[in-house]
Amino acid sequence: MKAQLLTIGDELLIGQTTNTNAAWLGGRLSRLGVRMTRTVTVGDAREAIFRELDRAYEEARLVICTGGLGPTHDDLTRTVIADYFGAPLQTDPDVLERVRQYYDRRNRDVPPSAPALAQRPEGFETLDNPVGAAVGLWHEAPDGRLIVLLPGIPEEMTAIFEASVQPRLEEQSGVGEVRHRTLVTAGIGETALQEKLGDLSDVLGDDVSLAYLPSTSGVRLRLSADARQTTAGARLDTVEAAIRERAGDDIIGTGDVTLEAVLGDALRARDATIASAESATGGLIGHRLTGVSGSSDYYLGSVVAYANSAKKTVLGVDEAAIREHGAVSEAVAVQMAEGVREALGTTVGVSTTGIAGPTGGTPDKPVGTVWVGYADASERHARRHQFVEDRTLNKELFASAALEEARRTLSV
């Protein structure tokens, strides 16, 4: 099944809001075996929405639109859809009652514009919104083409998709034509990974494709095969085995696994605990570790020691080490890791001290420099990394480097 996505809203075009809906839907549809062929973003303009809707509906069997389902004057999706299909808008009394109950539960007056939320084009089915007021809409044409309308608020969009859209799609013919398998790596960049894997053309053949999907925590390798072929599963197994043989312990798992979850499993398997001493990452390591359910089994806490005075008084870093080597140095990173390990009584301590930028760099320590420290009962070391010039991106990369340092050291 081919699909196209139309995301609607001026806020998306001007960069006021990040279009997370497109990324989320693309990933979810891909896992369902739906082939996304095009994604378009348009503003709150009737003609633009109509034009892009017409193109998508002509080219794809499934069209998903997000945004423009609210009750305000710039929420145009319902009326454009009604015009496109020549279907008059109707008020659904059941939806209208649910809208009233939604506001009553929150002790809020029902706004005069709220009844617009209960309108739907004739022939469309409503999809209940378990977390908001704006319902989704579903339409299946006699020729099997599908159009789905979802709210633009990400939490509402995902809730409706998971509860109502995905189950319906799974019943459709043509879904699952593409079979994917994702291998997750850590601690190696895209270029280095490509060089390590070498030429895979003989292994891939003509029936399996490989895509490199880099992120701040590693590179995902997505294998794709035609699910209609009876050999698809076996071929994916063969290619995966070849990649694992070449990549070794750079591969940390499959599917949606995360670096922090894999590290957590390694700690739990060893009945070990961890704490982080963070300077440049400002608590991001702790944030990522606590994003894993059950992380209280092994994560005890963090010390954000941004100033040199905090490094000395809280973590016990030597004044002489800072004076001789600087705060961004191997010696300080090691002492920070050991200091937080002793302070919190953990098995493992990790640390980051670096220059996230955009200022603060020197010829010897340019922006993007970070030292990652590691300490346990028998091992104390630090490793230097050089990343980019963007502050936000560097913080993510620094945190990933620390998590990966702990994972690799524990796996030895």
UniProtKB/Swiss-Prot annotation:
SUPFAM superfamilies referenced in this protein's UniProt entry, alphabetically: CinA-like, Molybdenum cofactor biosynthesis proteins
Alphabetical list of Gene3D superfamilies matching this protein: 3.30.70.2860, CinA-like, MoaB/Mog-like domain
Disulfide bonds: none
Pfam families, alphabetized: CinA (PF02464), CinA_KH (PF18146), MoCF_biosynth (PF00994)
InterPro entries (alphabetical): CinA (IPR050101), CinA-like_C (IPR036653), CinA_C (IPR008136), CinA_KH (IPR041424), Competence-induced_CinA (IPR008135), MoaB/Mog-like_dom_sf (IPR036425), MoaB/Mog_dom (IPR001453)
HAMAP family: CinA_B (MF_00226_B)
Family in the record: Belongs to the CinA family.
NCBIfam families referenced in this protein's UniProt entry, alphabetically: cinA_nterm, PncC_domain, PRK00549.1
Protein name (database record): CinA-like protein
Provenance organism: Salinibacter ruber (strain DSM 13855 / M31)
